[in-house]
Amino acid sequence: MFEFSIAIPAHDRGENGPKWMSELLDSLERQTFQDFEVVVSDQSKNDDIMNVCKDYDFQFTYIKYQGDVPCENINIALNHCEGRIIKPMFSDDIFLKDYALERIQKEYDKLGCKWAFSSDRDWET
């Protein structure tokens, strides 16, 4: 079992879609905390997102979602997650800090919470 599951519901985003997905996966590759899997549920009509994912050496679960209901796409990604902590991210999201997952895990465990949200802002807890 992984500590984190990164759940990514992907869909058509035009010519920017593959670029944004690459930027997201690059930000995951730079993380100091590496005990995670990546779960992509891809609702796009072409193979661009799948081809981007092939360039990375993560533990991947890739699902090609043939439907047209965005909330189902998100649920498919979430339902395939095996990690203790699930971090949903969209294909145009990135981690700004290389220690983001490490920080999320630390705060999550310190607070003993069941839900946590993250931001690029430092909040007092």
Q: Where do the model's predicted regions map?
A:
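Conserved donor NDP-sugar-binding/catalytic core segment of glycosyltransferases
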Residues: Y99-T125
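Active-site acidic short loop of glycosyltransferases
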Residues: D35, F58, C81-R84, L101
